[in-house]
Curated annotation (Swiss-Prot):
InterPro entries: PEP_carboxykinase_ATP, PEP_carboxykinase_C, PEP_carboxykinase_N, PEPCK_ATP_CS. It comes from Shewanella putrefaciens (strain CN-32 / ATCC BAA-453). Coiled coil: none annotated. This is Phosphoenolpyruvate carboxykinase (ATP). PROSITE patterns: PEPCK_ATP.
Length: 513
């Protein structure tokens, strides 16, 4: 469709976007029909280049700091205008989409991209509504101009690229970045700011539902198992990464999945494997000479990705919504090999571990990270995406758990028998067996043992799991060394938690240093 002096393609179809991407040299087709695109040096998020405009309507509610860096309103206006001028004579792709599957809590967003494959990504990951903006809400705007080069001296940025959120003007600007994940995480941050004011808990989690309508949530950082474990052939997928929990139910914030591809196999992850086909975007995946994706190849990045719409998954919840969850799973990847494979948490322990967000960066999604696996504390299991103070989200979680009676579990998808490099990682079948026991209700009111240093209750038996694995000390050859590592981990928890202003009941729910 012609628009002024240049071409603007409104609400283009998947086939059109794939065709444009190929014609414009943006990507290549794989043997399985997916489109491969490369992002260059920035093959992950750029947290050092993410800003929020500091303006009166939101200033008091944002936790400013290294995660939420402030940007001046005047500088934003100038940069937005420069990017618009830069795009004025370019071929562009535009879609009217929504973020949030709930009819009350959605946000309408117009996405404008310079690249066809970025538009395909947006249409895969956001929601394509039957009727756009049926409640006539003010519309958000995303502009994504990957070939625009920021000038820190002129633009007030930290580098040649920037991601800037403006809550007052409902604008998201992405400039100088090809990594498509920045688009989805920007709108996630927007909803993470807006939803608490509506009494809704936004969550960095996946969700699925059983045949009887029982919902399970899986919280966790990238690479800890959210996508893999929620893609369960026995259950229906609601979503793999971002959800809202309102009184009465949960809803997907997105319309698609952004699955990690490194070491992907048909045997271990059949649902994801089958979803990668025509219309899917593969980011930084290497192909062989026959165009067959090599999912073991991390030469471009550990953070290889597949972006596909939920419609690529046969067993999905059509409306992207579910009942309130009976089971909530916190996925932690423990590199010290100390935590048990599953623990049953009280509501105070749930708040403690939600605020702590102890886990590891596995094949990190951030640029500049090596393939080395490092332990980290990431508040709410997603610190980079939550603009408000952590206590706001923890209070909402406690409220929802209490009002519905959800049971929370801590599941370690990391190491046992020793730290990373010495012990071995729990295999996917073991973790799946634990999750099966959780969703079936098997672990409610079971006999447990108490691990004193970690202050955790561990079931003595889980169907399909070697009972020797359940108490982690059993898997260590050197029991004294295990006790030493457990004490070190408890001290790390205590030190990290000191910054939170919480009740004694929550503070005492953590490990005992």
């Amino acid at each position: 469709m012609a628009d002024g002096l240049h071409r603007v393609h409104y609400n283009p179809s998947t086939a059109q976007l794939v065709e444009f991407a190929l014609l414009r040299g943006e990507g290549e087709l794989t043997a399985n029909g997916a489109l491969v695109a490369k992002t260059g040096a920035r093959s992950g998020r750029s947290p050092g280049d993410r800003f929020i405009v500091k303006e009166p309507s939101s200033e008091a509610d944002i936790e400013w700091g290294p995660v939420n860096q402030a940007f001046e309103p005047g500088a934003f206006e100038g940069l937005w205008a420069r990017v618009e001028a830069y795009l004025a004579d370019k071929e562009l792709f535009v879609s009217d989409l929504e973020v949030g599957a709930d009819t009350e809590h959605y946000q309408p967003v117009r996405v404008t991209t310079q690249y066809a494959w970025h538009q395909l990504f947006a249409r895969n990951l956001f929601i394509i509504p039957e009727e756009f903006n049926r409640k006539d809400k003010p519309v958000w705007q995303i502009i994504n101009a990957p070939d625009f080069v920021c000038d820190p001296a002129r633009d007030g940025t930290n580098s040649d690229a920037a991601v800037i959120l403006n809550f007052a003007e409902r604008k998201v600007l992405l400039a100088g970045l090809k990594y498509a994940g920045e688009m989805k995480k920007s709108m996630f941050s927007v909803q993470n700011f807006l939803l608490p004011a509506q009494g809704v808990l936004p969550m960095h989690c996946s969700a699925n539902v059983g045949k009887d309508g029982d919902t399970t949530l899986f919280f966790g950082l990238s690479g800890t198992g959210k996508t893999t474990l929620s893609a369960d052939p026995k259950r229906f997928l609601i979503g793999d990464d971002e959800h809202g929990w309102a009184p009465g139910g949960v809803f997907n914030i997105e319309g698609g999945c952004y699955a990690k591809c490194i070491d992907l196999s048909q045997k271990n992850e059949p649902v994801i494997w089958d979803a990668i086909r025509f219309g899917t975007v593969l980011e930084n995946v290497v192909m062989d000479e026959h165009r067959v994706p090599n999912y073991k190849d991390s030469s471009l990045t550990e953070n290889t990705r597949a972006a596909y719409p939920l419609e690529h998954i046969a067993q999905r919840k059509e409306d992207k919504c579910g009942a309130e969850p009976h089971a909530v799973v916190f996925l932690t990847c423990d590199v010290s090999g100390v935590l048990p494979p599953v623990s049953i948490l009280t509501k105070e322990q749930a708040a403690y571990h939600f605020l702590s967000g102890y886990t590891a960066k596995v094949g990190s999604t951030e640029i500049g990270s090596t393939s080395a696996i490092q332990s980290t504390f990431s508040t709410c299991f997603g610190a980079p995406f939550f603009p408000r103070p952590a206590g706001v989200y923890a209070e909402l979680l406690m409220k929802r758990i209490e009002s519905f009676g959800s049971q929370v579990y801590l599941v370690n998808t990391g190491w046992t028998g020793g730290p990373h490099g010495v012990g071995k990682r729990f295999d996917i079948p073991t973790t799946r067996a634990i999750v099966d026991a959780i969703v079936s209700g098997e672990l409610k009111d079971v006999e447990t043992i108490h691990l004193d240093t970690l202050n955790l209750a561990v079931p003595v038996a889980v169907t399909g799991v070697d009972s020797n694995l359940l108490n982690p000390i059993n898997t260590w050859g050197d029991k004294a060394l295990y006790a030493e590592y457990a004490q070190k981990l408890a001290e790390a928890f205590t030190k990290n938690f000191a910054k939170y202003q919480v009740s004694d009941a929550i503070r005492h729910a953590g490990p005992k240093a």
